[in-house]
């Protein structure tokens, strides 16, 4: 299983990388824009934060296949081994096919249906990123879509994997993992929610109080 953080906040990546067993960091144009940093400045800093073995994801901006391929090559030259995120449009599928031949690893992003995700995988994307909460927000069933996509990839594109994205709650992320997803990416607030469990703090405080009452200190 691969766990990623969905952010361009270098300080938070450094903080959470000490705690979470993260495989890397995913970004998108909105996330990079929110950081107020040039993508060419922030990507090296993110790579440094996750280490040489961490995987970094960044997205192209062009709307046509030729431009996507050119931008993907620029990203790959700047950060060798980066996974390039390509929106799964008609032009995006064409770009994924071309990049597969070039040996550049891709992720098919902005996936709102299982069929769309399958096409990305068949075109050559190593990762496919379904938008769980956004599907829910449009009246669909994000988890059901992920389940269908996971089954389709297992049967027809076993070299590709679901990297589920767009979460508002830890429960959504866990449901994707229960559906068989091999990778998820968490926004910072959802990652923090996984750490903040009031019942755990209450239990620890009770242990400490009992120990202190018995021994007068909190030392072993």
From Swiss-Prot:
Its EC number is 4.1.2.-. The active site is at 85 (schiff-base intermediate with substrate). GO terms for cellular component: cytoplasm. It catalyses: beta-D-fructose 6-phosphate = dihydroxyacetone + D-glyceraldehyde 3-phosphate. Keywords: Carbohydrate metabolism, Cytoplasm, Lyase, Schiff base. It comes from the Bacteria. Homodecamer. PANTHER family: FRUCTOSE-6-PHOSPHATE ALDOLASE 1-RELATED, TRANSALDOLASE. This is Fructose-6-phosphate aldolase. The lineage of its organism: Bacteria, Pseudomonadati, Pseudomonadota, Gammaproteobacteria, Enterobacterales. The gene is fsa.
